[in-house]
Structures are given as structure tokens and as C-alpha cells.
């Protein structure tokens, strides 16, 4: 089905599939310190998932597909959260800009993202092609799974 895009299907499935694609192709170079770094100053620990960098890059790609261009500042705002201050009130806190910057640089090095003349980064034509191709694969897998199960028969 040629008309299927990323906007037409479940976003969690897109993010998971793109993360698997990024890891399998080997286009994305993960920085050395990303296995021990925290994703934000309001977090207590580093992520448990060893592939969190691929998932974060996939999420950034999906975000750039919908709303482009976006820079490091907007990415840190998206992944921000609540900083708990003990007995004091909680406040919003941005995510770590180092992780966002390294993710955007890795995507740019893989030629999935390119710099926008007005600032920030936008999805390149190669990145959009890959995301649409992955969306088509997800739809075909869902259709094949529906064909395998067949019609639902209710007996009395």
C-alpha cells in the first residue's frame, strides 16, 4: 500500500521498529559514554535498557517527521520531566542537552537528518524514505497476522 506513512499507524510500533532498524543497519554510531550517562538531571539512574540510545534516536526521527525543524533546545524540552525536590515543590526540568546533541549528531552523521538553514535540524529525504518504508512493513505484518488468524467464529 503506497499511501501509508508514519502518521497512519501506531507510534509505539513505529518507534520500536525504527530502533531495531537503526541497530540492525549499523548506520548509527553510539558514543562511548552513553552507557553510563543519565538522560536528565531529574533522573536518579541511567537507563536500564542497553539499547536506549537507539530508541531515543528513533523517537527523535519520529518527532522530526511530524514537526520539523527542531533543535537541541526543543528536544530537551520534549524529554523533560518533573524534578522532585524532596520536601519542596516539584518543578519542570529539561532533559540533558548532551544526550540530545549526541543523538542529533549521530543521526546527522547517518544522513537521516540534515541542518535547516533557519536553525535546528530537519528530516532528510533519505530519513523520510526509510521511515515510510518501515511504516509499510509494519502495515503488511499486521495484515499478514490478521490473515493468519482468520475470521472469528463464535459458537454456541
Curated annotation (Swiss-Prot):
Is Ribosomal protein given among the entry's keywords?
yes
Its Gene Ontology cellular component terms are: cytosolic ribosome; cytosolic small ribosomal subunit
Keywords on this record? Ribonucleoprotein, Ribosomal protein
The keyword Ribosomal protein belongs to this UniProt entry's keyword annotation:
yes
Q: List the disulfide bonds.
A: none
Q: Which GO terms describe its molecular function?
A: RNA binding; structural constituent of ribosome
Question: Could you tell me which InterPro entries the record lists for this protein?
Answer: Ribosomal_eS19, Ribosomal_eS19_CS, WH-like_DNA-bd_sf, WH_DNA-bd_sf
Which GO terms are recorded in the biological process aspect for this UniProt protein? cytoplasmic translation; ribosomal small subunit assembly
Name one matching Pfam family: Ribosomal_S19e
Give the protein family: Belongs to the eukaryotic ribosomal protein eS19 family.
Name the UniProt record assigns to this protein:
Small ribosomal subunit protein eS19A
- Species assigned in the record: Drosophila melanogaster (Fruit fly)
- Gene (name only): RpS19a
